[in-house]
Amino acid sequence: MSLDPAIAAKLKRNDAGLFSAVAQEKSTGDVLMVAWMDDEALARTLETRKGTYYSRSRQQYWVKGETSGHTQYVHEVRLDCDGDSVLLIVDQEGAACHTGTHTCFDTDVLLAAEQ
């Protein structure tokens, strides 16, 4: 798969050719996770509607839920104003975080809402 050249032209990548991808749950608005993508991962996501990312540590592509069953169905993909990040609006089946929790953002609250 290759990314549409019109989309590729809008992306700003880091030195490794990557950009960040934020997965947000459609039904709740919760931010579930942040991962990395490159052009190929984005092309696969757009083609299959499955959250597909690039692992920097393993240097390979991975489809969310491929081994765990905790899949992401992608409803929308949006490019941010700077072109260096994408937002995936998803239906999350099971845990989004590799620790087994629904979101990766449930461990440490660094600043809580004022009461």
Swiss-Prot record:
Transmembrane segments: none annotated. GO terms for biological process: L-histidine biosynthetic process. SUPFAM superfamilies: HisI-like. Zn(2+) binds at C81, C97, C104. Its cofactor is Mg(2+); Zn(2+). It catalyses: 1-(5-phospho-beta-D-ribosyl)-5'-AMP + H2O = 1-(5-phospho-beta-D-ribosyl)-5-[(5-phospho-beta-D-ribosylamino)methylideneamino]imidazole-4-carboxamide. Binds 1 Mg(2+) ion per subunit. Its main location: cytoplasm. One of its GO terms (cellular component) is cytoplasm. GO terms for molecular function: magnesium ion binding; phosphoribosyl-AMP cyclohydrolase activity; zinc ion binding. Belongs to the PRA-CH family. Catalyzes the hydrolysis of the adenine ring of phosphoribosyl-AMP. This is Phosphoribosyl-AMP cyclohydrolase.
